[in-house]
């Protein structure tokens, strides 16, 4: 099956209903989202920002991301309520090499909008795109303290693959446990079509 991410993106924007009854729009990040996207990161508590691999408080970093969107490598889907970007999930892909069949998922939701199911909807959307793109697996990386996020991913079928104690350092050089979770996207051919 031939798959084009650009073709898949034509189904956006999507309107979704959150647990609290409010509606959110899911859509790809756009070049002109720079200021609103930066505001999302500024709204994340400093303690949590230490776990983000990039200096997201620097507008230049966000500007570069928005300017150079390459959906084949990094596909960010944002969650918007009203006109405010309140969450993002990204599918990170390697286009060659021995991990080309594995995508990586990252997700972030503004604290004021957590607990409404937005992160779940964003990750499900990204996993669906990954599956349709022919990826066989997706992974998600965590710092050991991110219990709520790991629980949400587990409810979506991700399982713990690796847990390394005191393995990574945050932006303040403090060591933390590293956890890698994964989801198998490949349908077992033996069971394909069963029950239908």
Region spans (language model):
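Short acidic N-proximal helix/loop "leader" segments that mark the beginning
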Residues: 1-20
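Conserved acetyl-CoA-binding loop-helix of GNAT-fold acetyltransferases
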Residues: 107-109, 115-132, 151-155
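A short beta-loop-alpha structural element at the N-terminal edge
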Residues: 24-36, 158
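C-terminal "cap" of GNAT-fold acetyltransferases
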Residues: 166-196
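Acetyl-CoA-dependent GNAT
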Residues: 54-101, 106, 110, 184-186
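A short gly/proline-enriched turn/hairpin at secondary-structure junctions
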Residues: 47-54
């Amino acid at each position: 099956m031939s798959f084009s991410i650009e073709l898949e993106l034509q189904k956006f924007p999507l309107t979704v209903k959150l647990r609290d009854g409010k509606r959110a729009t899911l859509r790809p990040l756009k070049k002109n989202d720079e200021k609103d996207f930066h505001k999302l990161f500024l709204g994340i508590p400093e303690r949590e920002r230490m776990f983000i691999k990039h200096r997201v408080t620097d507008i230049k970093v966000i500007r570069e991301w928005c300017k150079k969107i390459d959906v084949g490598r990094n596909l960010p889907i944002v969650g918007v309520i009203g006109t405010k970007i309140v969450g993002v999930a990204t599918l990170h892909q390697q286009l060659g090499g021995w991990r080309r069949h594995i995508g990586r998922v990252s997700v972030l939701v503004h604290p004021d909008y957590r607990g409404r199911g937005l992160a779940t909807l964003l990750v499900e959307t990204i996993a669906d795109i990954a599956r349709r793109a022919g990826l066989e697996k997706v992974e998600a990386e965590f710092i050991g303290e991110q219990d709520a996020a790991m629980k949400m991913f587990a409810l979506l079928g991700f399982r713990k693959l690796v847990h390394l104690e005191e393995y990574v350092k945050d932006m303040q050089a403090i060591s933390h446990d590293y956890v890698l979770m994964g989801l198998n996207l490949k349908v077992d051919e033996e069971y394909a079509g069963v029950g239908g």
